[in-house]
A protein has these predicted regions:
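A short beta-strand micro-motif
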Residues: 3-8
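GIY-YIG-like beta-to-alpha core
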Residues: 11
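Short, surface-exposed loop and linker segments with low hydrophobicity and enrichment for Pro/Ser/Thr
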Residues: 1-2, 29
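Tandem repeat scaffolds
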Residues: 14, 18-203
Length: 203
């Protein structure tokens, strides 16, 4: 079998190594043995359906990694990079994801119930569909637009689709309609517009 090693992305030192059928098998064995994988470099790997629950890998770099169907429940993945990561059908339940960066990450049927998301950063529309209502903590979360605007997201965003030709997203302090941003002080005016369109659809 080929030789695989798990290295830190900071100084490239080897954390764990051995002969395995795949890097995923190497990672799963390291997690099974309770090896600390702090700062592990897992960038641009295919970890589809990986079973790494209870993993100890704060500050991990998972940028560009395919984590579709992976089980990362009850893990410490705080301060990690999830840039452009695929997280479809991924289980992050009960995990510590505090201060992790999810810019560019794609979500779909992603489980985050009981997860600590305090201070996390998001940027994709699919992130707004996450079930934040059942997360343990999402205080100080931020949503960053493609234009570089930062929106506070300490509460679950409200997403309205199908009413206009662009989604309407209500964040803590602002309302985003497509590329336009409005203050929540405009809510009465927006409510009137939405009421008009709703009535138009019904009739």
């Amino acid at each position: 079998m080929p030789h695989f090693s798990l290295k830190k992305h900071t100084d490239h030192s080897i954390i764990f190594e051995g002969n395995y059928a795949s890097l995923k098998d190497c990672l799963e064995h390291a997690v099974e043995r309770n090896i600390s994988l702090s700062h592990v470099n897992l960038k641009n790997h295919n970890l589809t359906n990986a079973n790494i629950d209870n993993a100890d890998m704060p500050y991990a770099d998972l940028s560009g990694t395919n984590l579709t169907g992976a089980n990362l429940s009850e893990a410490d993945i705080s301060n990690a990079l999830f840039h452009n990561c695929g997280l479809y059908n991924t289980c992050l339940s009960e995990s510590n994801l505090k201060n992790s960066d999810f810019r560019g990450a794609s979500f779909g049927a992603t489980l985050i119930n009981g997860a600590n998301l305090r201070g996390c950063v998001f940027s994709t529309l699919s992130a707004c569909d996450l079930d934040f209502q059942h997360a343990a903590d999402m205080f100080f979360c931020q949503y960053i637009t493609t234009e570089g605007d930062h929106y506070n997201m300490s509460n679950p965003p409200i997403v309205i689709k199908g009413l206009l030709n662009v989604p309407i997203i209500i964040f803590d302090d602002i309302i985003k309609i497509g590329s336009k941003t409005l203050s929540k002080t405009n809510m009465p005016q927006i409510s009137h517009i939405l009421s008009f369109y709703t009535h138009k659809i019904i009739t």
